[in-house]
Amino acid sequence: PQDDVAEPAAVMSPGFDVSSWVDAIVPGTVFASYVAAGLEEDPNFGDNIARVDRAKYDRSFWYRAEFAVPQDFDKEYVWLNFNGVNRKADIYLNGKLLGTLDGFMHRGRFNVTDVVTRDGMNVLAVLVHIPQTPLANYGSPTYLCSGGWDWMPYVPGLNSGITDKVYLSNTGRVTLVDPWIRTSLPSRARAELSVALDVRNNSPEKVRAVVTGTITPGNVVFSQEVELDGNAMRTLRFDKRYFPQLCINNPRLWWPNGYGEPNLYSCRFEVKVDDTVSQSQEVTFGIRQYSYDKNDNTFHIYINGVPVFVKGANWGMPEYMLRCRGEEYDLKVDLHRRMNFNMIRNWLGVTTDEEFYEACDRHGIMVWDDFWINSNPNLPYDIHVFNFNVVEKIKRLRNHPCIAVWCGDNESNPQPPLEGWMAENIRTFDGGDRYFQANSHADGLTGSGMWKAFDPRYYFLEYPDGLEGDPARGWGFRTEIGTAVMPNYDSFIKFMPRENWWPRDEMWNFHYFGPSAANADHVQYDALLTKGFGAPDGIEEYCRKAQLLNIQTNKAMYEGWLDHMWDDASGIMIWMGQSSYPSMVWQTYDYYYDLTGAYWGAKSACEPLHIFWNPVTDAVKVANTTARDFSGLQAEVKVYNLDGKEVPAYTRRVRFDSPSNTAVECMTIPFAREREIISLGKPTYASSSEYSSPADATDGKSDTRWSSRVADNEWLYVDLGSKQPVGGVRLNWEASYGKAYKIQVSDDARTWNEVYKTYEGREGVKEILFPEVDARYVRMFGIERGWWYGYSLWNFDVLGGSPVAEELSDTHFIRLRLTDSEGNLLSENFYW
């Protein structure tokens, strides 16, 4: 700690005694280094991290290293490079202050030629300063969730440290700065490349240099001579006007997962002075072109002219203490590819490592890339430092083909002037090649959430509602929706003390199954698990049954969106795809890479060619989220009772074609669907009545109606007499319809639970189905009238639960198979 160093100058002296210091992990954080040294109990386990003395780490720390310059450094200039610190650092070499890095995207490239000694030891000392609090958004740019969120704990030290690579490099007099390769596609048969880079003369003398780029595959070579004054920098540009070889015929395009191969190119840049290489760099890129629209107020993404139906997931921290490094990113991203995802949202931009983007490039995973602003209506302490880091991020990452969207703010718009600055930065330093979406859940998006488990039918109905978003609700493009996800038993016991296994107690809350993750609603998760699979008698049974719920819920989320593909659904990303901390919420694979039921549910639903069942309408559809048409496919349905015997009355087979980017209905399973009207003649009450009685809406007649006074917040409810299964309502609106209204249920007519809401009511008959719920009272609650009179209903019919045919057991199974014209299996699915 800085406080423990009485003489900072001594730290910078050779031979300084560091025997009492802690070995630092670089890249890494201060707290992670202390944990690795065994000076703190395992923070993954129990409530250990909550018992750490925060004051011990919430302060500035010194890093120190001694090094020798490599003997093979035979060029004139030696550079000391920093790729990232959190949050701020003062860099000293051999007692000389080289500079200060401010913000975790701020790169440091220090010319230390005249500071280092090449024939002895050098002392590097770095004073790392903790982020300012509160982090959101005052402390930004930083890892905002380091102060704790509803899925990860407060990390002592707020993940301060040297968080990215530190290395020496050796060059000649002339160096290259931030090469930038842009690609455009007049057609998919022809690509046009443009290249820009800065060339810097680091010496005081005028120099003549030659810059060459070589693109592979294809061995495309381009070159230009440049003359530079002493200590000058110049921008070079290469494009088809003077370098026709940058027009590439039949290019190998970069495609997202499911739409084609994620082909990559590399360009090796060299700058030579006097025919000697002064510096070389290699840049990996992909030939692709993104485009976008917001037709019908819904955000759509296209790549290479093809619409992409987005199936993806959010990432929070890659690991809550920044211990995910190198090849581990490849594992994480590959698991997303194996789930058939095509996008990851880098939530709040808290994944900063180059290896993440490289893995997404390789695996064909697009990135929705946030900046570091949460919905709090405040600005960072230093908006100019923030803006500098925005530019740094764009320059560092713009060559990655995986980046599809830049996003300004999580669940709001950046406060002025940041939104305008971000937009201009993207136009200037990314050429407008990627879209800037200022708000993560509005302006063409359908809100955030919900984040808890529901009956599968919920996701197919007109009520997969999100918070905020655009008034025209629907499926649309949803950047966050999720559920609690209990891990498998073998993972659970790795982080939970034995005495807290069962029954559940407060220790579970430390791992986010309780009030600490209220949005995950552990109570509803429990209720669905018990109702669907029976009450568990211990932790092993609970974990086992939870996997069935995890499969069922996560599969239904994606299938609900696929069921409305392009009408109006265009994309869905669950909250979240991976786990940064051992928890029981919002994950597909867990912290230990064990695959939960959520993984298998998502993997099934997101396969490129997928057969699925709508549990509300009983329609069977095939979703084709590829760039390829399929013909002569066969869909097959079989239904089995609990005894394993097939019920032949429901067997169906049909042949059909599946065009690219469609969801085609191929058949309907003939389950009984006529629901009983259970409200006829039942007592009915209203907030007001004009020229009619509330009972006129439940008398079964088509020529009598209830009407309210002229006001918005009016209601009508029916008393069914006792609790019974309710599965929907059928409204017949007169010309004075409800434009926005809710359907609510209650056991006591005092506390009401919402089961449906719409902002798009219309005159006429509207049948609304929702997951069955036991209730005595059912209410229509008006929010906004569609006409200048009050609300008026010819009929308010309450519908009972789904009927079950006599030949079917209460629990029965549906098996779906999709084969090609030669009988090869393409997709298989199941339900119970």
Task: Set out the residue ranges of the language-model regions.
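Active-site-adjacent substrate/metal-binding segments within catalytic domains
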Residues: 32-69, 73-82, 86-93, 99-102, ...
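Short strand-edge motifs at loop-to-beta-strand transitions and within beta-strands
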Residues: 63-65, 106-110, 232-238, 662-667, ...
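Extended acidic/polar, glycine-enriched regions
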Residues: 117-121, 196-294
